[in-house]
Curated annotation (Swiss-Prot):
This is Thiol:disulfide interchange protein DsbL. Residues 28-221 form the Thioredoxin domain. Keywords: Disulfide bond, Periplasm, Redox-active center, Signal. Gene3D superfamilies: Glutaredoxin (3.40.30.10). The gene is dsbL. GO terms for molecular function: protein-disulfide reductase activity. Its main location: periplasm. It is found in: Periplasm. The keyword Disulfide bond applies. InterPro entries: DSBA-like_thioredoxin_dom, DsbA/DsbL, DsbL, Thiol_disulfide_DsbA, Thioredoxin-like_sf, Thioredoxin_domain. Pfam families: DSBA. Residues 1-27 form the signal peptide.
Length: 222
Protein backbone atom coordinates (compact mmCIF):
# COMPACT_ATOMS: atom_id res chain seq x y z
CA UNK A 1 0.00 0.00 0.00
CA UNK A 2 1.66 3.25 -1.08
CA UNK A 3 2.24 6.13 1.31
CA UNK A 4 0.41 8.41 -1.12
CA UNK A 5 -2.70 6.22 -1.04
CA UNK A 6 -2.65 5.99 2.78
CA UNK A 7 -2.35 9.77 2.98
CA UNK A 8 -5.33 10.12 0.65
CA UNK A 9 -7.46 7.85 2.86
CA UNK A 10 -6.43 9.79 5.97
CA UNK A 11 -7.46 13.07 4.38
CA UNK A 12 -10.79 11.56 3.40
CA UNK A 13 -11.45 10.38 6.97
CA UNK A 14 -10.54 13.79 8.41
CA UNK A 15 -12.82 15.54 5.90
CA UNK A 16 -15.70 13.18 6.70
CA UNK A 17 -15.25 13.82 10.43
CA UNK A 18 -15.18 17.57 9.87
CA UNK A 19 -18.37 17.45 7.85
CA UNK A 20 -20.08 15.34 10.52
CA UNK A 21 -19.06 17.63 13.38
CA UNK A 22 -21.78 20.28 12.97
CA UNK A 23 -24.43 17.59 13.25
CA UNK A 24 -23.07 16.14 16.49
CA UNK A 25 -21.77 19.23 18.29
CA UNK A 26 -23.82 22.15 19.55
CA UNK A 27 -24.67 24.71 16.90
CA UNK A 28 -25.21 27.39 19.55
CA UNK A 29 -22.82 29.35 21.74
CA UNK A 30 -23.21 30.99 25.13
CA UNK A 31 -22.55 34.69 24.76
CA UNK A 32 -23.62 34.68 21.12
CA UNK A 33 -26.96 32.91 20.98
CA UNK A 34 -27.91 33.02 24.65
CA UNK A 35 -26.74 34.00 28.10
CA UNK A 36 -27.14 32.50 31.56
CA UNK A 37 -29.07 34.83 33.87
CA UNK A 38 -27.24 35.79 37.05
CA UNK A 39 -30.60 35.82 38.83
CA UNK A 40 -32.81 33.03 37.42
CA UNK A 41 -36.58 33.37 37.37
CA UNK A 42 -37.85 31.16 40.22
CA UNK A 43 -40.11 28.15 39.71
CA UNK A 44 -39.61 28.19 35.94
CA UNK A 45 -38.29 24.72 35.18
CA UNK A 46 -39.54 23.24 31.89
CA UNK A 47 -40.90 26.57 30.65
CA UNK A 48 -40.40 28.92 27.74
CA UNK A 49 -41.13 32.36 29.12
CA UNK A 50 -41.80 35.35 26.91
CA UNK A 51 -41.44 38.74 28.59
CA UNK A 52 -43.53 41.19 26.58
CA UNK A 53 -45.46 44.45 26.61
CA UNK A 54 -48.56 45.57 24.76
CA UNK A 55 -46.59 48.76 23.93
CA UNK A 56 -43.69 46.89 22.29
CA UNK A 57 -43.80 46.78 18.46
CA UNK A 58 -41.41 43.83 18.21
CA UNK A 59 -43.49 41.87 20.74
CA UNK A 60 -46.44 42.35 18.39
CA UNK A 61 -44.44 41.19 15.36
CA UNK A 62 -43.09 38.13 17.16
CA UNK A 63 -46.54 37.20 18.45
CA UNK A 64 -48.00 37.40 14.95
CA UNK A 65 -45.47 35.11 13.31
CA UNK A 66 -42.93 33.52 15.64
CA UNK A 67 -44.03 32.78 19.21
CA UNK A 68 -46.84 30.34 18.41
CA UNK A 69 -44.95 28.21 15.88
CA UNK A 70 -41.87 27.99 18.12
CA UNK A 71 -43.94 27.12 21.20
CA UNK A 72 -45.70 24.40 19.20
CA UNK A 73 -42.40 22.86 18.05
CA UNK A 74 -41.07 22.59 21.63
CA UNK A 75 -44.32 21.76 23.45
CA UNK A 76 -43.04 18.28 24.29
CA UNK A 77 -40.22 19.78 26.38
CA UNK A 78 -41.42 23.12 27.74
CA UNK A 79 -44.65 24.94 28.54
CA UNK A 80 -45.09 28.42 27.10
CA UNK A 81 -45.64 31.05 29.81
CA UNK A 82 -46.13 34.77 29.03
CA UNK A 83 -44.81 37.38 31.49
CA UNK A 84 -46.26 40.85 30.89
CA UNK A 85 -43.98 43.78 31.71
CA UNK A 86 -45.90 46.17 33.95
CA UNK A 87 -43.28 48.93 33.78
CA UNK A 88 -43.57 49.60 30.03
CA UNK A 89 -46.40 51.63 28.52
CA UNK A 90 -48.75 54.12 30.14
CA UNK A 91 -51.14 51.31 31.04
CA UNK A 92 -48.74 48.51 31.90
CA UNK A 93 -50.42 47.85 35.25
CA UNK A 94 -53.92 47.60 33.79
CA UNK A 95 -52.71 45.36 30.97
CA UNK A 96 -50.94 43.03 33.40
CA UNK A 97 -54.06 42.73 35.53
CA UNK A 98 -56.34 41.79 32.64
CA UNK A 99 -53.73 39.46 31.16
CA UNK A 100 -53.42 37.63 34.48
CA UNK A 101 -57.20 37.33 34.75
CA UNK A 102 -57.67 36.10 31.17
CA UNK A 103 -54.85 33.58 31.54
CA UNK A 104 -56.61 32.16 34.59
CA UNK A 105 -59.92 32.05 32.70
CA UNK A 106 -58.31 30.26 29.76
CA UNK A 107 -56.65 27.73 32.05
CA UNK A 108 -59.94 27.00 33.83
CA UNK A 109 -61.66 26.50 30.47
CA UNK A 110 -58.87 24.30 29.12
CA UNK A 111 -58.18 26.74 26.28
CA UNK A 112 -54.68 27.24 24.86
CA UNK A 113 -53.28 30.76 24.94
CA UNK A 114 -52.76 30.41 21.17
CA UNK A 115 -56.34 29.34 20.45
CA UNK A 116 -58.61 31.80 18.67
CA UNK A 117 -61.07 31.33 21.56
CA UNK A 118 -58.48 32.42 24.13
CA UNK A 119 -59.58 35.48 26.09
CA UNK A 120 -55.91 36.24 26.73
CA UNK A 121 -55.17 36.24 23.00
CA UNK A 122 -58.23 38.33 22.17
CA UNK A 123 -57.32 41.04 24.69
CA UNK A 124 -53.65 40.99 23.71
CA UNK A 125 -54.23 41.43 20.00
CA UNK A 126 -56.93 44.04 20.56
CA UNK A 127 -54.42 46.18 22.44
CA UNK A 128 -51.63 45.41 19.98
CA UNK A 129 -53.78 46.46 17.02
CA UNK A 130 -55.15 49.56 18.73
CA UNK A 131 -51.75 50.75 19.94
CA UNK A 132 -49.52 49.87 16.97
CA UNK A 133 -51.86 49.86 13.97
CA UNK A 134 -54.38 52.53 14.92
CA UNK A 135 -51.97 54.58 17.08
CA UNK A 136 -54.53 54.75 19.88
CA UNK A 137 -53.09 56.17 23.12
CA UNK A 138 -56.17 56.44 25.36
CA UNK A 139 -55.33 60.01 26.44
CA UNK A 140 -51.69 59.13 27.22
CA UNK A 141 -52.28 57.56 30.60
CA UNK A 142 -55.17 59.76 31.65
CA UNK A 143 -57.97 57.33 30.80
CA UNK A 144 -57.24 53.86 32.19
CA UNK A 145 -60.94 52.97 32.02
CA UNK A 146 -60.97 53.44 28.23
CA UNK A 147 -57.81 51.38 27.85
CA UNK A 148 -59.21 48.58 29.99
CA UNK A 149 -62.50 48.65 28.08
CA UNK A 150 -60.65 47.87 24.83
CA UNK A 151 -59.27 44.69 26.37
CA UNK A 152 -62.46 43.74 28.20
CA UNK A 153 -64.63 44.15 25.11
CA UNK A 154 -62.28 41.98 23.06
CA UNK A 155 -62.24 39.29 25.74
CA UNK A 156 -66.01 39.43 26.17
CA UNK A 157 -65.71 40.18 29.87
CA UNK A 158 -67.60 42.64 32.05
CA UNK A 159 -65.95 45.08 34.42
CA UNK A 160 -67.61 43.33 37.37
CA UNK A 161 -66.37 39.91 36.26
CA UNK A 162 -62.86 41.29 35.84
CA UNK A 163 -62.81 42.95 39.27
CA UNK A 164 -64.03 39.79 40.97
CA UNK A 165 -61.48 37.57 39.20
CA UNK A 166 -58.65 39.99 39.95
CA UNK A 167 -59.02 39.18 43.65
CA UNK A 168 -58.44 35.46 43.11
CA UNK A 169 -55.23 34.15 44.78
CA UNK A 170 -54.02 32.50 41.56
CA UNK A 171 -54.30 35.78 39.66
CA UNK A 172 -52.45 37.69 42.37
CA UNK A 173 -49.78 35.00 42.40
CA UNK A 174 -49.29 35.43 38.64
CA UNK A 175 -48.92 39.18 39.02
CA UNK A 176 -46.35 38.65 41.75
CA UNK A 177 -44.36 36.25 39.56
CA UNK A 178 -44.35 38.74 36.72
CA UNK A 179 -42.34 41.23 38.77
CA UNK A 180 -39.28 39.20 37.77
CA UNK A 181 -39.85 40.38 34.20
CA UNK A 182 -38.30 43.78 34.90
CA UNK A 183 -34.81 42.46 35.64
CA UNK A 184 -34.88 40.32 32.50
CA UNK A 185 -36.16 43.14 30.29
CA UNK A 186 -33.33 45.43 31.43
CA UNK A 187 -30.77 43.20 29.72
CA UNK A 188 -31.84 43.47 26.07
CA UNK A 189 -35.36 44.86 26.13
CA UNK A 190 -38.46 43.01 24.98
CA UNK A 191 -39.50 40.58 23.74
CA UNK A 192 -37.26 38.43 25.91
CA UNK A 193 -37.44 34.65 25.70
CA UNK A 194 -36.15 32.66 28.68
CA UNK A 195 -35.77 28.88 28.82
CA UNK A 196 -36.12 27.09 32.17
CA UNK A 197 -35.93 30.44 33.92
CA UNK A 198 -32.19 30.82 33.37
CA UNK A 199 -31.24 30.91 29.69
CA UNK A 200 -32.00 34.21 27.95
CA UNK A 201 -32.09 33.94 24.16
CA UNK A 202 -30.44 36.75 22.21
CA UNK A 203 -33.26 37.67 19.85
CA UNK A 204 -30.96 39.67 17.56
CA UNK A 205 -29.28 36.42 16.51
CA UNK A 206 -32.44 34.43 15.78
CA UNK A 207 -32.25 33.28 12.16
CA UNK A 208 -35.53 31.39 11.71
CA UNK A 209 -38.39 29.70 13.53
CA UNK A 210 -36.70 26.32 13.16
CA UNK A 211 -33.34 27.51 14.48
CA UNK A 212 -35.00 29.22 17.44
CA UNK A 213 -36.93 26.04 18.22
CA UNK A 214 -33.70 24.07 17.98
CA UNK A 215 -32.01 26.45 20.42
CA UNK A 216 -34.92 26.19 22.86
CA UNK A 217 -34.76 22.40 22.69
CA UNK A 218 -31.04 22.41 23.37
CA UNK A 219 -31.33 24.80 26.32
CA UNK A 220 -34.32 22.91 27.73
CA UNK A 221 -32.23 19.75 28.04
CA UNK A 222 -29.06 21.32 29.46
Amino acid sequence: MSAKWINSIFKSVVLTAALALPFTASAFTEGTDYMVLEKPIPDADKTLIKVFSYACPFCYKYDKAVTGPVADKVADLVTFVPFHLETKGEYGKQASELFAVTMAKDKAAGVSLFDEKSQFKKAKFAWYAAYHDKKERWSDGKDPAAFLKTGLDAAGMSQAEFEAALKEPAVQQTLQKWKAAYEVAKIQGVPAYVVNGKYLIYTKNIKSIDSMAQLVRELATK
